[in-house]
């Protein structure tokens, strides 16, 4: 488990550069760890073909990939210029009831200090199907820190946009105006703009217009299109989805596209250091199956690394990763990360049985990985 955590901190630069800076375990001659991907036998070939036969297109942000039907989406998140966006199936009656109950909940929330009351500051009725709550960030923080919580109903989909804001218009915050200013009006514009540009989307629907896909919805807008009221003139977009095998819950794929991350090195640069650390720490299950650069349609600077490791479930399993655009980092060329695990439960799998061995063999895992990742590409007209 410790080895996997160390490996993750090196692979994902945003999670911990400290380990790289401190380590001096630069051991040469790692070629002995490169075993290659084993050839599939007939049973393994049938297993992979069963996955391939059911692949269907799935939209992830501004990209798409063909996922086998055996994989179920278990996690989805979208953040655009600090605004968290989500969708939920509902009815108009349930929507109206939710808004009423949410208002009552916020209005009845107490604050730690009397001067920060009321907790619910305002309720903006943008139109008959769109409302925005303006409330304190929490019950303890001064009420200059706000949350704008917007909801919009479109057919049978309720969209939510949540964004932090600052309001120091009250006289007791006069001293703070020297180093920061109220931005609530601008952030309200941002929330309303995002809500207006959201529309429902079916699970396997692939839009042909610029915008971002997320679970249950689509946010229209070009990659270089500014967002009214946002703190930055350019877009910052982060989208992530996790798909878990319905039959083998220790097999999952995680996709992440993040325009805010730009690194000085690449995946293969970092994995050279990771291999040295794994070798020095003595993971008996560690081996490199394949690594190198690869071509993905419409995506530059893509690299992959496929290995065997001792997973967090303390079994021999597979950890595969693709990273692209790591040295570019923009809304038009976001950093892309695709991670595949075999022999380890994802964080979204709360209740699971003990694992004695990984569900797939190395050959099956690599074959499934190739079938999925080689279909990953930029969606037509997405940007």
PLM ranges: what are they?
Residues 6-17:
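Bacterial N-terminal signal peptides that target proteins for export
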Residues 40, 45-89:
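N-terminal mature-domain "stem" immediately C-terminal to a signal peptide or N-terminal signal-anchor/transmembrane
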Residues 106-155, 256, 260-331:
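Signature of long, low-cysteine stretches enriched in small and polar/charged residues
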Residues 174-300:
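Acidic, serine/threonine- and glycine-rich low-complexity intrinsically disordered segments
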Residues 31-34:
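Bacterial signal peptide processing site
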Residues 74-118, 160-164, 238-275, 316-328, ...:
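A short acidic-to-branched-hydrophobic micro-motif
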């Amino acid at each position: 488990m410790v080895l996997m955590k160390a490996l993750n901190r090196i692979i994902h630069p945003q999670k911990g550069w400290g380990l790289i800076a401190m380590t001096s375990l630069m051991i040469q001659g790692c070629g002995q760890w490169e075993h290659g991907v084993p050839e599939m036998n007939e049973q393994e070939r049938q297993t992979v073909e069963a996955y391939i036969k059911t692949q269907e297109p799935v939209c992830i942000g501004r990209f798409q990939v063909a996922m086998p039907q055996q994989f179920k989406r278990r996690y989805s998140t979208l953040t655009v210029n600090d605004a968290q966006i989500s969708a939920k199936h509902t009815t108009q009656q349930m929507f109206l009831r939710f808004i009423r109950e949410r208002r009552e909940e916020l209005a009845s929330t107490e604050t730690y200090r009397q001067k920060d009351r009321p907790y619910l500051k305002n309720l903006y009725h943008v139109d008959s199907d769109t409302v925005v709550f303006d409330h304190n960030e929490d019950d303890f923080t001064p009420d200059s820190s706000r949350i704008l919580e917007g909801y919009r109903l479109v057919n049978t989909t309720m969209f939510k946009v949540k964004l932090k804001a600052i309001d120091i218009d009250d006289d007791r915050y006069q001293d703070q105006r020297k180093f920061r200013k109220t931005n609530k009006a601008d952030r309200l514009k941002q929330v309303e703009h995002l809500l207006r540009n959201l529309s429902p989307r079916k699970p396997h629907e692939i839009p042909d217009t610029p915008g971002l896909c997320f679970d249950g919805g689509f946010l229209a807008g070009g990659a270089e299109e500014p967002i009214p009221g946002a703190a930055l003139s350019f877009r910052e977009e982060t989208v992530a989805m996790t798909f878990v095998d319905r039959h083998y819950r220790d097999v999952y794929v995680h996709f992440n596209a993040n325009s805010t991350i730009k690194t000085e090195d690449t995946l293969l640069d970092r994995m050279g250091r990771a291999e040295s650390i794994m070798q020095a720490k003595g993971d008996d299950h560690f081996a490199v199956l394949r690594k190198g650069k690869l071509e993905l349609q419409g995506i530059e600077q893509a690299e992959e690394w496929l290995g065997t490791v001792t997973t967090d479930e303390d079994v021999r399993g597979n950890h595969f990763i693709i990273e692209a655009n790591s040295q570019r980092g923009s809304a038009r060329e976001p950093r892309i990360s695709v991670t595949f695990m075999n022999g380890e439960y994802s964080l979204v799998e709360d209740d699971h049985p003990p694992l004695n061995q990984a569900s797939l063999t190395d050959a099956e895992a690599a074959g499934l990985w190739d079938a999925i990742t080689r279909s990953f590409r930029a969606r037509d007209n997405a940007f």
